[in-house]
Amino acid sequence: MILIKNAQIINSLHDKVEKADILIVDDKIKKIGKDIEENPEKMTIIDASGKVVMPSFTDIHCHLREPGFEYKEDIKSGSRSAAAGGFTTICCMPNTNPPVDNRAMVAYIKYRAREVSPIEVLPVGAITKGLLGEELAEIGFMKEEGAIAISDDGKCVMNANLMKNALLYSRDFSIPVISHCEDTNLSEGGQINLGYVSTITGLRGIPREAESVIIARDILLAKETKSHLHITHVSTKESVRLIKMAKEWGVNVTADTCPHYISLTEEEVLGFNTNAKVNPPLRTQEDVEALIEGLKEGVIDCISTDHAPHHKDEKNVEFNLAASGTIGFETAFSVLFTYLVEKNGFDIGKIVELLNHNPRKIIGLSPNVLKEGEKANLVIVDLKKKWEVKEENIVSKSKNSVFLGKLLTSYVETVIYNGKILKKDGVLNC
């Protein structure tokens, strides 16, 4: 048994904040109430005074690198990193080696996760065989085996007819298509956002329309096919406008952006910081503001981390040779609190919706809720704690965080999943 004392419970934007104790028995919340009787001999007692308790988080877009790239990350190390950041459900992308493009590979990911992961790992299947953009993968069989979405993330499905067929199949199998929107005819060879910083650094730029033209295409295809299109890692103001327009049309489109896109700009790459090389690239302050407004209005539905671990040897090279991507599990909540709550006046309940209710709804799961009889999936957060992101404190096998050296506010101190304590008082136990 676990007893959390003096909890300030935040379930969502619309629920009132409740101050109470939480009693956890086995994997469920047994009781929520005032002054629950303590029994130190039979229960673990956690004092949450001055902290908030909220449902644990879900990430619908991450990379665990297994199989094939275990030197960067694997299912066990990635899951531990996710747990450290408060995530107890994560959806891993199929760009592994071999790719997750068939029933057997989906089964493998699920088997490995059951074997080594302390949290829930859900596989995303590929749209096309081998992620080659030439032939549709086994969408129906992968859905049967447990894939929760399909995506060729890391690559764009450039063939519009193939993408249309993928959307048609996804509709028939009731599975969302997660679209990586990048016109490679426009972005090929690009390193950073096309603009002021690309000009002064001499690095080849990626025009913003490389993202928005594919978003426009996919919205029209989703409208025609009446399919669920999910647009991932949105980075430009034009993209936000297009998604807003699509929702006004009644298109079944959802979208996410990432912590680094709502907090940082292209100026992070001044000095050729390869940890700031991500795809899509960091954009301008105008884009940051448009993304924040999109989150506020509900145009962008949720936050994903796009946790993309890379070995130090793939980052400690010339900028144009460096791999694209940043890790994100362990900093996600703190970045959102620092840049959305502290700096832009978001309600903390809105962050719960962006990290729990909305991503789970997109992939067809009910939200984690702190109510009697529900599964005990929760985090305890110190909203006042300030901490610096340091390489030596990162749990992930790779350390390529764009937030290294930055000071963030709020810290996920304790994580409980299905009644098991994965992290307590900042110490990971899984």
From Swiss-Prot:
It catalyses: (S)-dihydroorotate + H2O = N-carbamoyl-L-aspartate + H(+). Zn(2+) 2 binds at residues 153, 180, 233. This is Dihydroorotase. The active site is at residue 306. It comes from the Bacteria. GO terms for molecular function: allantoinase activity; dihydroorotase activity; zinc ion binding. Its cofactor is Zn(2+). The keyword Lyase does not apply. Binds 2 Zn(2+) ions per subunit. Keywords: Hydrolase, Metal-binding, Pyrimidine biosynthesis, Zinc. It comes from Caldicellulosiruptor saccharolyticus (strain ATCC 43494 / DSM 8903 / Tp8T 6331). Zn(2+) 1 binds at residues 61, 63, 153, 306. Gene3D superfamilies: Metal-dependent hydrolases, Urease, subunit C, domain 1. CDD domains: DHOase_IIa. PROSITE patterns: DIHYDROOROTASE_2. Substrate binds at residues 63-65, 95, 279, 310.
